[in-house]
């Protein structure tokens, strides 16, 4: 995988310190670079995004991507944004078609 080629590790279903799981985690040694959660339903999406942000925060991630296949903007004008901001988690909603390119760009920016 592209991560290992440049010194990062990708871990599927990373177990968190409190027993939850993060769908995909990008790590570099002991540093937690990026938590990625895949959401395939628009039902309760705001609450699910908040839960994902709490999981990421509690496990030491400050960057979270929500991979979301729908065209609507689940966080636009949302009460959830304020709570996530207070956690100090940088969150981005990413379309599945953009994930690989965005991961490559993020990791390249961290290496060079």
What spans do the regions from the language model cover?
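Non-catalytic C-terminal interaction segments of nucleic acid-processing enzymes
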Residues: 1-2, 27-29, 62, 74-112
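Active-site metal-binding core of divalent-cation-utilizing nuclease and nuclease-like domains
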Residues: 1-31, 41-46
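Acidic-enriched, low-complexity/disordered segments with a strong bias for Aspartate over Glutamate
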Residues: 18, 23, 59-62, 112
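Catalytic cores of nucleic-acid endonucleases
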Residues: 38-93
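Residues at the C-termini of beta-strands that transition into short coil/loop
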Residues: 14, 39, 95-97
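Surface-exposed beta-strand edges and their flanking turn/coil or helix-capping segments
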Residues: 23-25, 48-51, 106-108
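Conserved beta-strand edge residues that scaffold enzyme active sites
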Residues: 17, 70-71, 98
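Hydrophobic "anchor" residues on beta-strands that sit immediately upstream
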Residues: 33-35
């Amino acid at each position: 995988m592209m991560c290992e080629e440049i010194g990062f590790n990708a871990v599927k279903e990373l177990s968190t310190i409190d027993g939850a799981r993060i769908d995909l985690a990008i790590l570099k040694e002991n540093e937690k670079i990026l938590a990625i959660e895949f959401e395939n339903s628009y039902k309760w999406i705001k609450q699910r995004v908040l839960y994902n942000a709490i999981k990421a925060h509690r496990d030491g991630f400050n960057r979270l991507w929500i991979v979301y296949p729908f065209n609507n903007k689940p966080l636009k004008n949302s009460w959830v944004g304020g709570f996530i901001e207070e956690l100090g988690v940088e969150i981005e909603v990413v379309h599945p078609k953009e994930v690989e390119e965005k991961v490559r760009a993020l990791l390249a920016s961290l290496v060079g």
